[in-house]
Amino acid sequence: MTEGTATIRTRKFMTNRLLARKQMVCDVLHPGKPTVSKTEIREKLAKMYKVTPDVVFVFGFKTNFGGGKSTGFALIYDTLDLAKKFEPKHRLARHGLYEKKRPTRKQRKERKNRMKKVRGTKKSKVGAAAKK
C-alpha cells in the first residue's frame, strides 16, 4: 500500500507505568481501500511515537461493515526486554520473538506410554521426570 492512503488516529491513550507501556485504541481510516496490514500500522505508529517498530504490538482489529474504517488496539513498550516479559507468547511468536520448543514425536510418545503405567497423582511425578 502506498504512503498516505490510510490515516491512523489514536484515542483512549493511557500510559501504563506498571507494565512500562503506552496503550491505546487505534482507528485506521482507509476509504475505498482494503484493510491495512498490521505491519504497516506498526510502522506508522512507530513513526508517530518515535520508537522502533519492534516494540509496537497491534492486535484485535475489526473492520466496520462497508469498510473504510478499522478499529483495534495498540501497545508500545518502553524496551524490547519489557515487551518479551509482559506480552503473551502467541503475540511474540507473530513478531518472530518467540519459538515454542516442542519435544520430538518419539519423546511425546515415550512420555505418554510412561504415563499409562501409573495411576492418579503419581502421573504428575512421572510427567515431570520425563520433561527433565
Curated annotation (Swiss-Prot):
Example of a GO biological process term: translation
Name recorded for this polypeptide: Small ribosomal subunit protein eS24
GO cellular component terms listed in the entry, alphabetical order: ribonucleoprotein complex; ribosome
HAMAP family according to UniProt: Ribosomal_eS24
Region (Disordered): 92-132
GO molecular-function terms, A-Z: structural constituent of ribosome
Biased composition regions of type Basic and acidic residues, renumbered to the chain: 92-101
Similarity comment: Belongs to the eukaryotic ribosomal protein eS24 family.
Keywords: Ribonucleoprotein, Ribosomal protein
Pfam families: Ribosomal_S24e (PF01282)
Family annotation (Gene3D superfamilies): 3.30.70.3370
PANTHER family on file: 40S RIBOSOMAL PROTEIN S24
Species assigned in the record: Spodoptera frugiperda (Fall armyworm)
